[in-house]
UniProtKB/Swiss-Prot annotation:
One of its GO terms (biological process) is tricarboxylic acid cycle. It comes from the Bacteria. It is found in: Cytoplasm. It catalyses: L-seryl-[isocitrate dehydrogenase] + ATP = O-phospho-L-seryl-[isocitrate dehydrogenase] + ADP + H(+). The lineage of its organism: Bacteria, Pseudomonadati, Pseudomonadota, Gammaproteobacteria, Pseudomonadales. The active site is at 372. This is Isocitrate dehydrogenase kinase/phosphatase.
Length: 569
């Protein structure tokens, strides 16, 4: 080893790469307003995918910089990396996005070293950022007081958030009525009533969102005002939302990531946490596009939970998967999914295809109907954190992925998703009204995914879950495809009477052929549920319905899927 080991130079190069990533990330994000104002819906989808892919692309570039600048015997001397970490800490201490720069450093370390060399001495398993920072600032917000009337307050808001509104006075009247409907009359007349909105606008898909809170001397309510651009009619304020559950859904793990310019991410996350206290900060960071840091915060929450509870891993409730094995911690609202070594004979996919399908979900518009995933490699857990039956099953079905190393269980590869109640189990215990609502939403989920060019493939009830807000969400991705890749067909009429009696089809079936007429018995064993779903969403059984959606997608149409209830529409 040379006398001078280049810890400072390596740390600086890693941070320079982070600055480059942040600049490109911000450039894509800042284009969101123009794309919204010009109604460039397909460009919005492309920009969202490009921003998601940017992180790994830039990590790869910086990995190349480091390998070009330093010999491997120097760069990969892992015993020296605590020096790099120390130098890096000094560099990021004055920054306003220091928590993100820790995650970036971790990504570079993991791109250079195998996971068995991970330690808190070399990287940031635990954050070094103080919970209260000397440079921490309050979020950038605008405040509006009830000086005259609710309409005057709303007009003041829209004067500051200036767009080419089509009929602002009509919007103001409608939003005032919604506000009076949502809040008690005495609140609407309270002279201390104040609106605080985050200064930057949030953009996602075909919408823009003003986000903040309403408060008086006693209480506070979240506040979201979605804006839509009606081509040829200008921008309109579509709704005024103060219900915490509805606002939580807007920031759901089933949604695409917002584009919002946040030079100090912790500011905005702390602001959101005040109005959505039920959201974990991992989910809030992820919701604004910092999904890698969301992953860091998730992992820290997981290891903290394991260290401070008696929780043990169990197999997740529900029908065992044919491709994936799923386990969970009862006290931690997450499932862990691993790929089995052998699939059921009816499955034609292979391991590489399953991985590609799950990675695809990260970059497509999930329209509130697909759970976001996080991919992990080389998780290590204490053996005594597994129930024996759970560990035995995992070792049996996935011995290449789950490895016992003394008192440690190594999970070589897995995905995490939010835990939900499987739809088939939910229906078993649901009331008549709950069955109706769940099947209505199940059909809507399929339709909205299809309109976003996603075909679930395996649409069985067990592959959908019900969230705590009662929404039906798809979560099993090994057979998903783009809708435009599927060949929807009507079943040809039988050639002879004997054809109908045969157990074999009398027509050829290609690898991408789907016959919607076959859905009813495939989806529903319960005849009552089958009849109800046919009444609610019978068009899903018609190949022409699916072909119509395909035609619209090929024409470049981008559908409206709203993450909130639209009042009076």
């Amino acid at each position: 080893m040379t006398q001078h080991w280049p810890a400072g130079e390596i740390a600086r190069m890693i941070l320079d790469g982070f600055d480059d990533y942040r600049e490109h990330f911000r450039r894509i994000t800042l284009g969101a307003r123009e794309r919204f104002e010009q109604a460039r819906w397909q460009d919005i989808q492309r920009a969202a995918a490009a921003r998601i892919n940017l992180y790994e692309q830039k990590v790869g570039e910086v990995n190349g910089w480091l390998r070009d600048a330093f010999d491997d015997e120097v760069l990969l001397e892992v015993e020296q990396w605590p020096l790099v970490k120390s130098a890096y800490i000094r560099l990021i201490d004055p920054r306003l996005d220091d928590e993100l720069s820790e995650t970036w450093y971790n990504s570079l370390f993991c791109s250079l070293f195998s996971h068995d060399q991970i330690s808190d001495g070399c990287m940031f398993i635990h954050t070094t950022r103080p919970s209260i920072r000397s440079h921490q600032r309050a979020a950038q917000t605008r405040t509006y007081c009830l000086d005259a009337s609710l309409q005057s307050l709303l007009r003041a808001i829209f004067a500051d958030y200036a767009f080419a509104y089509g009929d602002l006075e009509s919007d103001v009247s409608r939003l005032e009525a919604q506000l009076r409907e949502h809040l008690p009359d005495w609140v609407c007349k309270d002279s201390t009533l104040t609106v605080e909105l985050f200064s930057p606008v949030l953009y996602r898909n075909k919408g823009a969102y003003l986000v903040g809170r309403l408060y008086n001397s006693d209480e506070q309510w979240p506040l979201v005002i979605p804006l839509l651009h009606r081509e040829g009619h200008g921008v309109e304020a579509d709704a005024l939302i103060t219900d915490e559950a509805e606002v939580s859904i807007i920031f759901s793990f089933t949604r695409s990531y917002f584009m919002v310019d946040v030079p100090v991410p912790a500011e905005f996350v702390n602001f959101l946490k005040r109005i959505l206290p039920g959201k974990h900060i991992a989910e809030l960071y992820t919701s604004i596009g910092f999904y890698k840091h969301g992953k860091s915060e998730f992992y820290r929450a997981l290891i903290n939970h394991l260290a401070n509870s008696d929780d043990r891993f169990i197999m997740a409730p529900g029908v065992r998967g044919m491709v994936m094995s799923v386990f969970t911690l009862p006290g931690f609202n997450t499932v862990f999914k691993i790929i089995k070594d052998r699939f059921s004979p009816s499955k034609t996919v292979d391991r590489a295809t399953v991985i590609d399908k799950y990675r695809l979900v990260k970059s497509v518009d999930r329209v509130g109907r697909m759970a976001d995933t996080q991919e992990f490699a080389d998780f290590r857990f204490p053996r005594d954190k597994f129930e024996p039956e759970c560990l035995a099953e995992l070792l049996e079905v996935a011995p290449s992925t789950v490895v016992l190393e003394g008192d440690t269980v190594l999970i070589r590869h897995c995905w995490t998703e939010r835990r939900m109640t499987p739809l088939n189990l939910y229906l078993e215990h649901a009331s008549e009204g709950q069955v109706l609502e769940a099947l209505e939403d199940y059909g809507l989920a399929i339709k909205q995914l299809a309109a976003a060019n996603i075909f679930p493939g395996d649409m069985l009830l067990k592959n959908f879950g019900v969230t705590r807000h009662g929404r039906v969400v798809f979560y099993d991705y090994d057979e998903i495809s783009f809708l435009t890749e599927v060949n929807f067909r009507h079943i040809p009429p039988p050639r002879y009477p004997e054809d109908e009696m045969s157990g074999e089809p009398w027509y050829s079936i290609g690898p991408h052929d789907v016959f919607p007429e076959e859905f009813p018995p495939f989806l529903f064993a319960d005849m009552g549920q089958r009849r109800l779903f046919s009444r609610l969403h019978g068009e899903l059984y018609d190949a022409d319905y699916w072909k119509g959606l395909q035609a619209a997608i090929r024409e470049g149409k981008v559908i409206d899927v709203f993450p909130y209830r639209r009042k009076g529409r």
